[in-house]
Amino acid sequence: MAHRRRCLLLLLAVLLPAMAARGDPDAVQDFCVPDAGRGRPVELAMLPAYPCRSPANLTAGDFAFSGVRAAGNFSPETGFAGVSVTPAQFPGLHTLGMSFARADLSAAGGVNPPHYHPRATETALVLAGRVYAGFVDSGGRLFAKVLEQGEVMVFPRAMVHFQLNVGDTPATVYGAFNSENPGIVRIPATVFGSGIREAVLERAFGLTPAELRRLEKRFGPPKKAEMED
């Protein structure tokens, strides 16, 4: 009995880290295009509730997407435009464990502000322009360089990263994620636009009340924290 118990504990010690390291669940079929109604908006979290459409009724069009041919809407403050594509926008991605995005940066200074994806690693391909890109690891070390057209950089999961157009022409970057729902946490908006008490931010960042009000105004009106005691 003791020997069996030791064997079981050893097996768990081997399997649990591997299970914890997994990303999205593995598919149990070739693909699953959800039967959610063509052209109808679908929440990403609700997709597993829909049955798969019959493979006999699928065409190549169900696995093609044209929504990233053009840039999204540019932010006048940052010169950034983003188009995110998950299975909610492109049902053909469902159960395939991936999503992607298009990022456009206006000439001479367009920036994708520091942010991170809590559930995915990202690979970013510079399709056009010159982009200064990088990430910061959990030890505070910066890994950054200027990427030329055709070059790729990887941003590890949950690491803060950014992109800045350092060229004289607009830049376009395509990002691919190893999760259907990578999530995104934008650092400036999260810190200064979420309603964190002013005393916390003033003390943490050494800001005066006037400086803090300016940042809160830029990144959105404070919202009452729903989970605050």
From Swiss-Prot:
Keywords: Apoplast, Disulfide bond, Glycoprotein, Manganese, Metal-binding, Secreted, Signal. Gene3D superfamilies: Jelly Rolls. Glycans are attached at residue 57. The keyword Transmembrane helix does not apply. Pfam families: Cupin_1. Its main location: secreted. The keyword Transferase does not apply. SUPFAM superfamilies: RmlC-like cupins. It is found in: Secreted, Extracellular space, Apoplast. Mn(2+) binds at residues 115, 117, 122, 161. May play a role in plant defense. Probably has no oxalate oxidase activity even if the active site is conserved. Belongs to the germin family. This is Germin-like protein 2-4.
